[in-house]
Amino acid sequence: MGPRNTFPLFALLLAFSADGAFAQQTADIDGVKAASKAFYEAVVVVDDGTAMEKVWAQTPYVTYVGPRSTAIIVGWEAQKKYWTEFNKPFSQRTVALVDAHVRVVGNLAWEIGTESGLAQMKDGSTRKVDWIVTNVYEKIDGRWLTVSHHVQPKPQ
């Protein structure tokens, strides 16, 4: 194969390689969006933390800072205890992620957006959900799982 034939072959291989990378990136973004959807379906379940157990990586390095957190919660075991206590005063919640922006790099992804909804407390009061949120996901054994969740009030 002469130099004249090598360049077109190289260009063709590069095009197929780039197309494969794009397809993988699209698949990963879709996977992160599915993990996000599962997270927000789990967060509205008022239980002992079982729903969240299905969407979080159960590792010692997961982190959580929620709207009622007084400290950074590190590790799955600490977080599981948190969810059990966190859910006690609620009778129900609705929460949706709006205006989400997703970025994937390798086996990590992050998503930033706004959480919007309403929480009904057991005492009959309601609380508006209107937070800025950052979620971090890790692809573990082919599955995107939450490894960090941080929410804060919107600046006034």
Describe each PLM feature range:
Residues 8-19:
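Bacterial N-terminal signal peptides
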Residues 26-27, 154-156:
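Generic C-terminal helix-cap and adjacent flexible tail
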Residues 102-109, 122-125, 137-143:
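A short, structured loop/turn motif at beta-sheet edges
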